[in-house]
Amino acid sequence: VNRPHPAPDRAGRRRFLKIAAAAAGSAALPTRPAPSLSPRHVERDFLLGADTEIQLYHPDAQAARAAIARCLAEVRRLEAIFSLEQPTSALSRLNRSGRLADPPPELVALLGRAAHFSRATCGAFDVTVQPLWELFRRHFSAGDADVNGPAAGNIERALSRVGYRQVQISPEHIALGCDGAAITLNGIAQGFITDRVTEMLQAQGFDQVLVNMGEMRALRGHADGTPWRVGIAHPDQPWSSFLTLPLVGRAIATSGGYGTPFDASGRHHHLFDPRSGTSANHYRSVSVLAPDATTADALSTGLFALPPKAALAVLNAYPNVGALLLTTEG
């Protein structure tokens, strides 16, 4: 995963996605729903290190609240598996020891999906980039940091620990490839959790749903038949949207280096090219619209590290996926 997992980075990215969606979506909502329409239920929380939101329409408020509560409990359970902030999480234990026996099936499944997207993007998406993030964080945390970034030798040493092919995954155990290797799931876990919540609600009979767990996925639209409307944040003004899209039966994710810059110029940021070991700068942002949030999340991350021609080649393999690649030239 090219995006690091720690909470400050996740929170910044989630907030601009949430604000963009709220700003764009609020205009589509009637000020006072017609009496014949099901009421809208909105639940906001602080999960996965950032603000989250579930919106749904249903005539039974008690049933809606109970369903949302079950979903939030599931999010917390998955967070205890995927989190790097929780020292007892399955991922933290894997990174500490390099091996994990009897891993949770959700971790096995998610790493399997991640490996698929790594292969599909020729390694541009890689869950093992955490050593690069640690290197850049340490470098730019120093008061006299070289503005050009870490020394080439230090990047090479970090890169020697990066490589999705080194990770061994089975239902019985997961093993990292070498000492100092570490995994971050921040380029795919939010999408996975968004899908889990959406599918739980759908299984319980809720279909007019918009879920935001860092990535967004919608089922049917509003009670009045209008679609949900989601705004894509402007790279220079992340609190505002430069484009608003309808969202029904689809998911969307956006990646942008402006979300967590390491330096004032923004040239060094949290979206790494795991092949070069440096921040990718082909685009200001990449937004992906896909049937599910896991795909949207992973591809928005992986495509960010690919030049346009290579990115389009990847997209050709996904006929149900669309992308907006906002280049540095605008």
Predicted regions mapped to residue ranges:
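Mature catalytic core of soluble alpha/beta enzymes
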Residues: 1-330
